[in-house]
A protein has these predicted regions:
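Glycine/serine-rich loop-strand microenvironments at binding/catalytic pocket rims
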Residues: 1-17, 53-67, 153, 157
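N-terminal beta1-alpha1 ligand-phosphate binding loop
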Residues: 2-40
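Glycine-rich phosphate/pyrophosphate-binding loop and the adjoining helix
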Residues: 2-4, 41, 57, 129-174
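A structural signal for isolated positions on well-ordered beta-strands in alpha/beta enzyme cores
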Residues: 13-15, 47-49, 103
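Short histidine/acidic/glycine/proline-rich micro-motifs that form metal-
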Residues: 20-23, 106-111, 137-142
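Residues at alpha-helix caps and immediate loop-helix transition turns in enzyme cores, especially N-
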Residues: 28, 81, 115, 145-148
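A short beta-strand-loop structural module common to alpha/beta enzyme folds
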Residues: 43-55
Length: 174
């Protein structure tokens, strides 16, 4: 008898790494997850994995195909927890996921510019492709920010569903 095994089908994996230190960030995270798990994307079979920034590691990054990152702004910078995540994964994962799509959401009480710039710089160094503009919220998180977070999660997941190289925003390559 011939043993016919079907080739293993690999499901695209979206890793959501977050530091959710406030109700505002919880609302943003929940909206991102709802977007990433949108019923229209469900048929693509994308696996959405969620990891707190202090628990996520290089193994998680190496197993993922795309990323959503969430952080509060602390003293004008990303949270120490997200920075710790990057410190842990940077060298083991450097260049391992070229072109992997990613998105970012940030919440602060005043200016989010420094945190956004820092995360973008590190993600660019990792070789990841920003496929949607960062969602930034200052002060209370309203319905508009939640909708933007939903769209962010759906956009990154849709890039994985397309099964082609991600296209960086603002470019025509890819």
């Amino acid at each position: 008898m011939i043993n016919r095994t079907s080739p293993e089908v690999r499901v695209p994996r979206l890793l959501v790494v977050h530091h959710t230190a406030s109700p505002a960030l919880r609302a943003m995270l929940e909206a991102v997850l709802a977007g990433a798990r949108d019923p229209e994307l469900a048929e693509s079979g994308i696996s959405v994995e969620v990891a707190p920034a202090l628990a996520a590691n290089a193994t998680d990054v190496l197993a993922a195909d795309g990323f959503v990152l969430g952080t509060p702004v602390n003293i004008g910078y990303m949270s120490g927890a997200l920075k710790h995540f990057f410190d842990q994964v940077y060298y083991p994962c450097l260049g391992a996921k070229p072109g992997a799509p990613y998105g970012l959401y940030v919440h602060g009480d005043n200016n989010t510019t420094g945190a956004v710039r820092a995360v973008q710089s590190i993600a660019t160094g990792m070789g990841w492709a920003e496929v949607v503009k960062p969602v930034t919220a200052v002060g209370p998180v309203g319905k508009d920010a939640e909708r933007q977070c939903y769209d962010l999660g759906a956009t990154v997941a849709a890039n994985l569903a397309l099964d082609r190289p991600a296209r960086r925003i603002g470019t025509t390559d890819g």
